[in-house]
């Protein structure tokens, strides 16, 4: 897939927190749904928990939008359940994730300039 322009990427931004954290769970390699769910919970120290409906609804949309893809890459058979589906981040998904990280970083910089941070509100 050709690299998208910033205007193309801005059409899908901002991402919902669920979609953002699902994408953020995948750059390290393939994961199945339950592993994504646990990684999101761990990354956010329990602040974001994805239920099955939210997780798999988001995965379905991410697959349709080609931000993630199913992969046949699996761990050793002894460690795996053949019913599991594994997902990877696509190049487009990586571009979208990077654009969202830039957008969020800009928002944090702006909040810092306005002296809006914990303890002042």
Go through the PLM ranges and name each one.
Residues 10-54:
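N-terminal helix-turn-helix DNA-binding core of bacterial DNA-binding proteins
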Residues 1-11:
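Short, Lys/Arg-enriched N-terminal segment that forms or immediately precedes the first helix
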Residues 65-80:
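Beta-hairpin "wing" of winged helix-turn-helix
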Residues 3, 92-121:
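Amphipathic alpha-helical dimerization/coiled-coil segments
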Residues 55-62:
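Basic amphipathic alpha-helical segments that dock to polyanions
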Residues 83:
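Exposed loop/turn and edge beta-strand positions of beta-sandwich/beta-sheet ligand-binding modules
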């Amino acid at each position: 897939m050709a690299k998208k322009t910033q205007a193309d990427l801005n059409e899908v931004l901002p991402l919902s927190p669920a979609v953002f954290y699902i994408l953020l769970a995948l750059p390290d390699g393939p994961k199945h749904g339950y592993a994504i769910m646990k990684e999101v919970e761990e990354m956010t120290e329990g602040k974001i928990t994805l239920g099955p409906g939210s997780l798999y609804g988001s995965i379905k949309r991410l697959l349709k939008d080609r931000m993630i893809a199913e992969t046949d890459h699996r761990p050793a058979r002894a460690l795996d359940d053949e019913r599991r589906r594994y997902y990877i981040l696509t190049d487009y998904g990586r571009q979208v994730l990077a654009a969202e990280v830039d957008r969020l970083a800009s928002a944090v910089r702006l909040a810092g300039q306005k002296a809006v941070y914990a303890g002042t509100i």
